[in-house]
């Protein structure tokens, strides 16, 4: 499976970058593609040719489809010199973003869970920062897993790598995150390591595996000085749960 995060389609990233992503992801021949938020860079108007960009993304190929959750930049806010500012009108919801995903054949999971191939669950969480600005609420991890069959593997997509203990306690086996860009610019790469328990890479939390990707795009200045953009390719093996164990690995 492939996970990508923080593409930030907008003024700096558009159809050319989309084409490169599609080419690299399809080369991995993934069974599942997960986009862990920040598909957009706030101002939808920044995408030069959204119809063409969505058409390019429709070329993504995987056995089980392409799924996404929202990130903190997936709402309408003005941008100046690469940085976002408060929306004075507080009209954060831009329906064009949802329409873009539908046109690109990307299924949004907004505090929702799907059972894939009757073999495993995929849950996409709402982003907490986005919820605060939009006066929305998101479910706790245990609410999202309360009615799931815990003998099947449960995969979470959560843009920000917070609540790792809560997600693990709720029964998730794999937690896919992004948001941090692994700092992107020096010395932010040092600071993110102090803010987040896992700012980039792999961490095992109890029986849960947490993976945080540095992201495929950029935020703010159109550069990276301390980290690399990436598409994260993950190999997952499903094994029958051991007796009296909730760990499927």
Regions found by a protein language model. Name each.
Residues 4-244:
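Soluble catalytic domains of enzymes that build or remodel membrane lipids, polysaccharides, and related
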Residues 1-3, 248:
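N-terminal low-complexity segments that are often proline-rich with Ser/Thr-Pro
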């Amino acid at each position: 499976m492939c996970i990508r995060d923080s593409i930030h389609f907008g003024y700096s990233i558009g159809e050319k970058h989309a084409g490169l992503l599609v080419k690299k992801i399809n080369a991995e021949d993934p069974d599942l593609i997960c986009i862990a938020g920040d598909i957009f860079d706030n101002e939808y108007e920044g995408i030069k040719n959204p119809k063409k960009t969505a058409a390019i993304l429709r070329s993504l190929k995987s056995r089980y489809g392409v799924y996404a959750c929202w990130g903190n930049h997936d709402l309408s806010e003005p941008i100046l010199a690469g940085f976002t500012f408060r929306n004075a009108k507080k009209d954060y919801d831009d329906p064009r973003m949802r329409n873009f995903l539908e046109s690109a054949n990307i299924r949004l999971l907004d505090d929702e869970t799907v059972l894939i191939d009757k073999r495993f669950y995929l849950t996409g969480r709402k982003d907490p920062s986005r919820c605060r600005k939009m006066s929305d609420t998101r479910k706790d991890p245990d609410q999202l897993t309360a009615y799931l069959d815990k003998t099947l593997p449960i995969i979470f997509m959560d843009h920000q790598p917070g609540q790792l203990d809560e997600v693990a306690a709720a029964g998730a086996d794999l937690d896919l995150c992004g948001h941090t860009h692994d700092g992107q610019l020096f010395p932010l790469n040092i600071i993110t390591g102090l803010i987040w328990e896992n700012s980039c890479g792999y961490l095992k939390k109890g029986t849960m595996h947490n993976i945080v990707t540095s992201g495929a795009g950029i935020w703010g200045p159109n550069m990276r000085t301390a980290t690399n953009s990436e598409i994260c390719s993950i190999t997952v093996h499903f094994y029958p749960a051991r007796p009296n164990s909730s760990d499927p690995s």
